[in-house]
Amino acid sequence: ITFYEGNKKEYDIYRETRKCAECMSVGLDVGVKDIAILSNGKKYENKHFKEKKKQSLIKMNRQLSRRWGPANSAFRDYNKEIREENKSNDDAEDKKNKELAKPSKGYLKIQKNHAKLERRIALQRETTYHQMTAEIVKQANFIGVETFYVKNMMKNHRLAYALGDAAMSDFISKLKYKAARSNIPLVACGMFEPTSQMCSVCGEINPKVKNLSVREWTCPRCGTHHDRDINAAKNILTLAQKTE
């Protein structure tokens, strides 16, 4: 792939092509407890970076609400009154418009520390996801994933915070570009496939597994004992290979 920057420079990027005797086809399921579960049984733990700093973030937000700044309701009400008063003074040349209130130094200091902590959390997550996705791509010659829409999943208020902390879309996007760079097919199966409920051995569907609290189950037809997430990853791989 050739890129040009004006008429001065030219960059050539060559896609990396790997030949690995030990590489395998893997299915990948994403989750909250483990961010990635592979069909070969490998699990990548979700580090919950934001959850670990939750109390610090809450404390800072509380401090911001008590300081003179945009997070304070009295500050917002005061500026609202000033705006309305200035608006009514537009046609009066003899009246001078009042300046809006500015945040206090204490507010700005806490706001800066809050932003630093948020950036640190984002950087920790990004670094970890780069390492995880690089390891997955290194051992695979085919990757199957499941189609999902985080926006719809976030409507579940019980899981919204955990889903936001997991940043599943960010993980998948990193996996996609690394797979493309290494010429590894990455195929997504359908969104509404019952991957968790279907036995990866005989294809029997167990509706009881719809309950998210069921982490392990035994197939009523063939008697195979399943880990919920690993079984889903195996089904994702099978469906993705059929979709390819």
PLM feature spans:
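Positively charged, helix-rich recognition surfaces that bind polyanionic ligands
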Residues: I1-E244
